[in-house]
Swiss-Prot record:
Annotated PANTHER family: ANTHRANILATE PHOSPHORIBOSYLTRANSFERASE
Biological or metabolic pathway of the protein: Amino-acid biosynthesis; L-tryptophan biosynthesis; L-tryptophan from chorismate: step 2/5
Subunit structure: Homodimer.
Name of this protein: Anthranilate phosphoribosyltransferase
Family to which this protein belongs: Belongs to the anthranilate phosphoribosyltransferase family.
Species of origin: Pseudomonas aeruginosa (strain ATCC 15692 / DSM 22644 / CIP 104116 / JCM 14847 / LMG 12228 / 1C / PRS 101 / PAO1)
GO CC terms of this entry: cytosol
Catalytic reactions of this protein: N-(5-phospho-beta-D-ribosyl)anthranilate + diphosphate = 5-phospho-alpha-D-ribose 1-diphosphate + anthranilate
Length: 349
């Protein structure tokens, strides 16, 4: 099926099969479609509402065309990632949580990009910290193996995305591609915490990842709108484990964490996000730093559980608390800065 045939189906509110979606995505991602066709396709899909089959097909093609990162093992390797678009503009929680996970003994294959609608994307934050982003796949793999955390810059590993960049920018609306980023980790991780911008996506995306071979995944959305675990409200979870998806909710109090507002955690730049994270991972001299530390732990703990390094969310959160409060997480951030600095010099030659 070509994109014109797909458009004809979509305007008649007919779904595509996984194979049909793969065919259309290959055309888009190899430069065979015009911007008008891509824009019409994305809006048509959104108006119709994307099915699990369609998302599976789109993800499969993006993974196929990605510049992958080969790791010696995927056991205990996890990604902590969100779709973004929650409008909260709080600091980069998932990036900070990644250093805590690494400090607790996990391996983090972090996939991310620059900010689209927010004030600070994961790439923006890490760049502000002095971490070199333009790494080859082999260099990323060494970071993960040696430091315990490595960052895969989406625009480096998903070069075919350039064909959809123009239409996405001109539309200025959430489209299918907002869902695809967290599902297309270049290292092929099978353990993830995926934050989404609406609760309605939790179970469908867990089912998508089940179809694509994931092993232990938490797809989450908090009641206050965050695409991650929150301190201020209950968080809805669709958990994929042992081949089954189940849904439930948790609150901070379930883990001995005080429920509190997110006031003071908003940032207006990557530098502001970095300063808050350094305080949270360091001596926590400010009230905001103390609160940020709690939120980081609330998100790092589930990642340790998803990585099967903890037998429960409660145990994962305790491990994360210990890793943060010993200062090891801050050391991991500094270690990644130093480790990637060597590659900055190598790649400049």
């Amino acid at each position: 099926m070509d994109i014109k045939g797909a458009l004809n189906r979509i305007v008649n509110q007919l779904d595509l099969t996984t194979e049909e979606m793969q065919a259309v995505m290959r055309q888009i991602m190899t430069g065979q479609c015009t911007d008008a066709q891509i824009g019409a396709f994305l809006m048509g899909m959104r108006m119709k509402s994307e099915t699990i089959d369609e998302i599976v097909g789109a993800v499969a093609v993006m993974r196929e065309l990605a510049d992958g990162v080969q790791l010696p093992t995927l056991k205990h390797v996890v990604d902590v990632v969100g779709t973004g678009g929650d409008g909260a503009n709080i600091f980069n929680v998932s990036s900070a949580a990644s250093f805590v996970v690494a400090a607790a003994g996990g391996k983090v294959a972090k996939h991310g990009n620059r900010a689209v609608s927010g004030k600070s994307g994961s790439a923006d934050l890490l760049e502000a910290a002095g971490i070199y982003l333009e790494l080859t796949s082999e260099q990323v793999a060494r970071c993960i193996d040696t430091v315990g955390v490595g960052f895969m810059f989406a625009q480096v590993h998903h070069k075919a995305m350039k064909y959809a960049a123009g239409p996405r920018r001109e539309l200025g609306l959430r489209t299918l591609f907002n869902m695809l980023g967290p599902l297309t980790n270049p290292a092929g991780v099978r353990h993830q915490v995926v934050g989404v911008f609406t609760q309605e996506l939790c179970k469908p995306l867990a089912e998508v990842l089940k179809r694509l071979g994931s092993e232990h995944v938490l797809v989450v959305h908090s009641r206050d709108g965050l695409d991650e675990f929150s301190l201020a409200a209950a968080t809805h979870i669709a958990e994929l484990k042992d081949g089954e998806v189940r849904e439930y909710e948790v609150r901070p109090e379930d883990f001995g964490i005080k429920s509190q507002t997110l006031m003071g955690l908003e940032v207006d730049s990557p530098q502001a996000s970095l300063e808050l994270i350094r305080d949270a991972l360091g001596r926590r001299k400010t009230e905001a730093g103390q609160k940020a530390a709690e939120l980081i732990v609330m998100n790092a703990g589930p990642a340790l559980y998803a990585a099967d390094l903890a037998t429960s969310l409660h145990e994962g959160i305790q491990l994360a608390h210990d890793a943060l409060h010993t200062g090891l997480a801050r050391e991991k951030m500094d270690e990644l800065v130093a480790f990637t600095a060597v590659y900055r010099e190598e790649n400049a030659q």
